[in-house]
């Protein structure tokens, strides 16, 4: 499994953000995956990146318990985090984020959860807008398996998280040692197809399968 996780981080860094020598890397990952820090550090060093800055995120149940209706503290925390990220926009930094696919929370705390999400939305928009102003900022967002997500998808499995990771590694190609090369070939093929379509200057395209019809 450790080898596959190394392959996965390799894909994230070399394909997702395509980190270059002497670049800063800002990584946002769930707190339950803090163990990936060692792999990020190792891979970044191999790719001659400058430094890795980490932000570990709690799930919503943890946040609701931690802040308990005192959401101004959470607001202040995200304000500080966002200010740090904004300062990195001018420092040749690339940004990688792995989010929880589905995040568990108590249904009875739905209103409190919405308050947390509104605070997050405010600072996410602030960072995104500033990133657009600066331009040419490389960032990559993805999802990462979690226990609750696995239980939702594989309710009959005895070890649903293991099953989800098995599928996830197949989809990301991290179960191949040459995953980066495979991804790059796929990207090149897509770019060649786009180039071909541009050259043909089609006025419209029609795509049809047994279940789908698409007209562009």
Regions found by a protein language model. Name each.
Residues 1-216:
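Active-site bordering "gate/hinge" segments
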């Amino acid at each position: 499994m450790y080898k596959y996780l190394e392959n996965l981080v390799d894909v994230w860094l070399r394909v997702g953000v395509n980190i270059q020598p002497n670049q800063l890397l800002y990584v946002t990952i769930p707190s339950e995956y803090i163990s990936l820090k060692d792999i990020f550090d190792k891979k970044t060093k191999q790719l001659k990146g400058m430094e890795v800055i980490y932000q570990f995120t709690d799930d919503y149940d943890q946040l609701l318990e931690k802040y308990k209706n005192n959401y101004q503290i959470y607001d202040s925390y995200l304000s500080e985090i966002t200010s740090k990220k904004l300062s990195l926009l001018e420092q040749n930094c690339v940004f990688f984020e792995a989010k929880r696919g589905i995040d568990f929370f108590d249904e009875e705390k739905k209103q409190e959860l919405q308050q947390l999400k509104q605070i997050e939305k405010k600072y996410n928009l602030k960072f995104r807008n500033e990133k657009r102003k600066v331009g040419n900022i490389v960032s990559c967002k993805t999802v990462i398996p979690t226990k609750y997500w696995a239980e939702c998808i594989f309710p009959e499995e005895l070890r649903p998280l293991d099953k989800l990771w098995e599928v996830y590694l197949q989809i990301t190609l991290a179960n191949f040692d040459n995953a980066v090369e495979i991804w790059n070939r796929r990207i090149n093929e897509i770019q060649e197809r786009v180039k071909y379509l541009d050259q043909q200057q089609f006025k419209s395209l029609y795509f049809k399968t047994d279940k789908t019809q698409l007209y562009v």
